[in-house]
A protein has these predicted regions:
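Short, well-structured N-terminal submotif of metal-dependent ribonuclease cores
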Residues: 1-40, 53-66, 136
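Short acidic, glycine/proline-enriched helix-loop-strand junctions
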Residues: 59, 64-79, 83-84, 92, ...
Length: 136
């Protein structure tokens, strides 16, 4: 079964109803109907929370976070091993640390697909399956 890895940029496109929001909704629906799995790293989840709080305030942040992920989705903790893997990706491939956590999750198997609107991942698309949402 496919496992989608959601990047914060994809989630924010969804909230903004931006380019690719419909694709993110398809991914969320596939997870809710158990046709696919969905994961997001705790660091990416935190990025989403911070951006929502800054834009909408605390009460809307919590409401929006609760509305995003189906209960079947998994927020993956930043373990010591994951932190070391992400650090290596950050240094070796010159990507942001939080992005390295998402990339590390996407590298778990050939059935994992990172969904993102961040074209900075083009520099590492040789390491994992990456689905890029349309440019704005």
């Amino acid at each position: 079964m496919i496992t989608y890895v959601l990047d914060s940029s994809a989630a924010l496109r969804y909230f903004d109803d931006g380019a690719g929001a419909d694709r993110v909704e398809e991914v969320l629906t596939a997870c809710a109907s158990r046709r696919a799995n969905l994961t997001i790293s705790a660091l990416q989840w935190g990025e989403i929370a911070g951006k929502l709080r800054k834009r909408f305030g605390e009460s809307d942040e919590i409401r929006l976070l609760n509305s995003l992920l189906p209960s079947e989705a998994t927020v993956v903790s930043a373990t010591a091993d994951r932190a070391v893997h992400a650090a290596a990706l950050k240094v070796d491939r010159n990507i942001a640390y939080a992005d390295a956590f998402a990339l590390d999750l996407a590298r778990a198997s050939p059935e994992h697909i990172l969904v993102t609107a961040d074209y900075g991942f083009k520099a590492v698309d040789d390491l994992a399956r990456i689905e890029f949402l349309p440019a704005k």
